[in-house]
Amino acid sequence: MAAMLEFRTSGYNPYAVKYSPYYDSRVAVASSANFGIVGNGRVFALGLTAQGLIAAGGDGSLKLFDLAVDEFPVMNFHEHKRETFSVCWNPVTKDTFVSSSWDGTVKIWSPTRPHSLRTLPIGSCTYSTSFCPSNPALISAVSSDSHLRIFDLRTPTSAKYHLVSTIPVHAAGSPPAEALTHDWNKYNDTVVATGGVDCIIRTFDTRSPAAGPLCLMQGHEYAVRRLAWSPHASDVLISGSYDMTVRLWNDASAHPSGPLAGAKPGHQLGVMNRHTEFVTGVDWCLFGVGGWVASVGWDERVLLWDSNILMGPGPRR
């Protein structure tokens, strides 16, 4: 594949990658020695500017970094009782962030306060949490009990700790499978995509919790570790998996529904198979022509590449 850049995180296995929301050439990578089993962690700032970034740790802590300050980190937050598995800035107000943990909680934080602002109980290992991209009061989470939960901070705390919707990811009658990742559609803020242990990517309309998935995207051979909707197209998303591939998808939302009820099948647009170990992180660049992607894996590699190549004519590799 042409148009691919590579950086090696020698001695450290990447766990997550994130493009800067301000500069198209700046990427942050979170990594751990010995595949995260034991040892130190390291955050690689590949050209990142002096903007703050938050990193989640295996000891349950969160650390805030500012590359303009010599002393690292500038803030420590430690309330989670087990590994913190995800963290997300509020994309609207930019003054809070949210974290999820294996301790079964989601916590909301301010970068200026050492203690969390609120705790949202999930009750099972919570792999991923996120803010709605257009509404700063809406928070989502997916967990090991195979459910997507939506919280609305505008509701009273007494109302189930702000819980407004619980959506089963697994089909009725099927055994639950751990949900590992999810993301809000950037153009339709009622649509959320999920992925997990059963290798299937599903999309849901949060307004209809009992309606089942809108779309099923099947193709991964092992668990889907990370997914992200495109910031450039409403019907395109990308996913990384333990099958060592990154796949590009179309959720078929632009096509009219047929007479049959049920979820639509999505379309796989292409496969990138240059990683030689588990793919643990994917993200889109917000700038440019729309298509540059960062992917990381346990092969100690950060790959930056143009996903438009996967949609071009000829064999998709």
Give residue ranges: language-model regions:
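Loop/turn segments within WD40 beta-propeller blades
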Residues: 19-24, 87-94, 113, 129-137, ...
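Surface-exposed loop/turn positions within WD40 beta-propeller blades
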Residues: 24, 40, 59-61, 94, ...
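WD40/WD-repeat beta-propeller blade N-cap
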Residues: 7-13, 50-51, 77-84, 120-126, ...
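Blade-level signature of beta-propeller repeat domains, shared across WD40, Kelch, NHL, RCC1
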Residues: 283-317
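Beta-propeller domains
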Residues: 2-7, 24-49, 67-70
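Short loop/turn segments immediately following beta-strands, especially the blade-tip
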Residues: 46-49, 67, 152-159, 205-209, ...
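WD40-repeat beta-propellers
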Residues: 36-47, 62-66, 106-110, 148-153, ...
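Conserved strand-to-loop turn within each blade of WD40 beta-propeller repeats
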Residues: 30-33, 39, 56-59, 99-103, ...
